[in-house]
Amino acid sequence: MIMELENQLSKLHELKNNLKEMGASLDLASLEKKSAELELKMQEAGFWDDVQKAQEVTQEAKRVKDKIDKFKNLNERIDDVEVLKELMEENDEETAKEIISEVKALSKEIDTLKIETILSGEYDRNNAILTLHTGVGGSDANDWTEMLLRMYTRWCEKKGYSLETIDYLPGDEAGVKSVTLKVKGEFAYGYLKAEKGIHRLVRISPFNANGKRQTSFASVEVLPELTSDQDIEINPVDLRIDTYRAGGAGGQHVNKTESAVRITHIPTGIVVQCQNERSQFSNRDTAMGMLKSKLIELKERAHKEKIEDLTGELKDMGWGSQIRSYVFHPYSMVKDHRTNVETSNVNGVMGGDIDNFIIAYLNS
């Protein structure tokens, strides 16, 4: 207990210095000024005339205030632990346990704040559009795509993010051929951009009667959902819009009306589709949002003027192109080939514990 307490008190000093450095990079005075300006803006006459814009300003005001409050709260808690240490009597195990627990909690929260300070790209705070596609591997690959879908769903639950299914195409025999989700929450894109690439699975195939080892691939594509002030104009002449009957898990509304929408951007050949809503108008609106995100990504790839984290094409979905390997047999190991971070806790990873991989990539 004494040795662990000493280690945590040493860690506390390190955390205090880290927080001080972050305070300088955050520029707290500027944040407080921005918070005051946003508060005044929200009090202006006619503020709610443009509801969407007003909601975005309100959300921005909350984000800024939350960041200020979080930083101040962490500083106060460090001070409280230091006071507790001074007041602690000899052999006071209860207070020692309290200090150890609080320093561990502070360490985790300061690490999160550090990452969110790094996530300063234009789109990092945005919601994310996450698309999974089956690669090489047949039914095994479809099953692998569904496993990844569960992994990201559980990760989102841990983060407090909400999910909305935009498009879903089941596999012929098992699993999922492709699925597109909207991940809603602050920094959803900033975190998930670290997952963009090819994911490889090695295991004994449940679809092979001889129990042979099978390698499967799936791709992960991540785009930011644009806000109104990041919007772009698209010439209607450049679009081909097709409607079709929605498929899916069944129900009285499935396959009865042509509510699903597919939009093709003729100059680039980009195709997006949405079948989530019962309304054709809603599906068209969602699909247009996805198209704009893809066009923004295309522009950033071509010019590399604003941000670097949208660059890079997905390679062919096969050997040698993966960003991460998930090996279930002949041993258990998940390894990220970009950072060399690895773990033998395969079940934990598939249960959504992927922050170690994401944070290592963002710090690299």
Swiss-Prot record:
Disulfides per UniProt: none
SUPFAM superfamilies: Release factor (SSF75620)
GO CC term (a single one): cytoplasm
Modified residues (N5-methylglutamine): Q252
Localisation per UniProt entry: Cytoplasm
Keywords: Cytoplasm, Methylation, Protein biosynthesis
Post-translational modification: Methylated by PrmC. Methylation increases the termination efficiency of RF2.
InterPro entries: PCRF (IPR005139), Pep_chain_release_fac_I (IPR000352), Pep_chain_release_fac_I_sf (IPR045853), PrfB (IPR004374)
GO molecular function: translation release factor activity, codon specific
NCBIfam families linked: prfB
Keyword Signal attributed: no
Pfam families registered for this protein in UniProt: PCRF (PF03462), RF-1 (PF00472)
Species of origin: Clostridium perfringens (strain SM101 / Type A)
Superkingdom: Bacteria
Functional summary from the UniProt entry: Peptide chain release factor 2 directs the termination of translation in response to the peptide chain termination codons UGA and UAA.
Protein name (database record): Peptide chain release factor 2
